[in-house]
Amino acid sequence: MAAAPDRQKALDAALAQIDKQFGKGSVMRLGDEVRAPIEVIPTGSIALDVALGIGGLPRGRVVEIYGPESSGKTTVALHAVANAQRQGGIAAFIDAEHALDPEYAAKLGVDTDALLVSQPDTGEQALEIMDMLIGSGSLDVIVIDSVAALVPRAEIEGDMGDSHVGLQARLMSQALRKITGRLSQTKTTAIFINQLREKIGVFFGSPETTTGGKALKFYASIRIDVRRIQTLKEGADSVGNRTKAKIVKNKMAPPFKIAEFDIIYGQGISREGGIIDMGVEHGLIKKSGSWFTYDGDQLGQGMENSRRFLRDNPELAAELERLIKEKLGVGVKPAEAEKEASPKLKAVDGF
């Protein structure tokens, strides 16, 4: 074995050659610099941000949101888009289903005038557009809605009844191999919305599976299973859904956490309702009968009145949200974010 000084000289020479050929920082020691905090995009639900363990969806990673129809998948994705735009970011939406409702998106806070939208004809076209947008280095978040609608060109141009086994899975595998590195380099979050299917002949375990093969399961840093569990009513009228999100996979924090939040028809995720739920759960908000109080002041009688009070007092809502996240140790502290994160990619707790 070579002497230690000789080995170190050989390593230094190799590192110098790598830096010269591939650019400075191509290889680094983990201890060389203090690592910047994980940069995130808030989801719009404080319960989901806490369940994710880092305060939102991580930048530079692949995220999969899946579940049954009308469970709130696109709503969660659009809230992430709106929050990225509030941070000054640029967002794109690949509408493979041709079903994006601009009016609904605007109600959720999305700047539809600035949102980049594509309605591709084939899966190849959709993924090529996505690859080019990510490669520009200008995007903060891109949503693909949905994986199931990424139909390969051969299937579209073929006849009904033709067999195209594995085409979509191969397409997804190739695309993810190409984009994963670029996402990390450009700090772009890619959100894939996916649908559920049932496997035939499964007698043990869940028969449910997602479309597009196994590649997305492997490449995704976070997978969120979104389900509608209850209909919210005011009198006889249905006003929204109670939604449960399970973090099925999480490379950034412990997985399998569960979050519940309300989605109000025409308004999206009830941020204020989530703050009240989490505040009560962690002792910041007191509930006595139907009354909710914070620091001796009454928020309102009943959930709807308390929601409305927080909506009319955004400073109080932001303070409660900050206190909840601080108590649970979730999100980036402002001083750390200012010191270590770049202005464009700075994590934001409030929105």
From Swiss-Prot:
Any single GO CC term annotated in Swiss-Prot or TrEMBL for this entry: cytosol
Protein's gene: recA
Chief location: cytoplasm
A Pfam short name: RecA_C
Family, per entry: Belongs to the RecA family.
Function, as annotated: Can catalyze the hydrolysis of ATP in the presence of single-stranded DNA, the ATP-dependent uptake of single-stranded DNA by duplex DNA, and the ATP-dependent hybridization of homologous single-stranded DNAs. It interacts with LexA causing its activation and leading to its autocatalytic cleavage.
Keywords: ATP-binding, Cytoplasm, DNA damage, DNA recombination, DNA repair, DNA-binding, Nucleotide-binding, SOS response
Keyword Disulfide bond recorded: no
Species whose genome carries this gene: Arthrobacter sp. (strain FB24)
Transmembrane segment boundaries: none
Record's protein name: Protein RecA
UniProt cross-references to InterPro entries, sorted A to Z: AAA+_ATPase, DNA_recomb/repair_RecA, DNA_recomb/repair_RecA_CS, P-loop_NTPase, RecA-like_C, RecA-like_N, RecA_ATP-bd, RecA_C_sf
Binding site for ATP: 67-74
Subcellular location: Cytoplasm
GO molecular function, one term: single-stranded DNA binding
CDD domains found in the cross-reference section: RecA
An annotated GO BP: DNA repair
HAMAP family: RecA
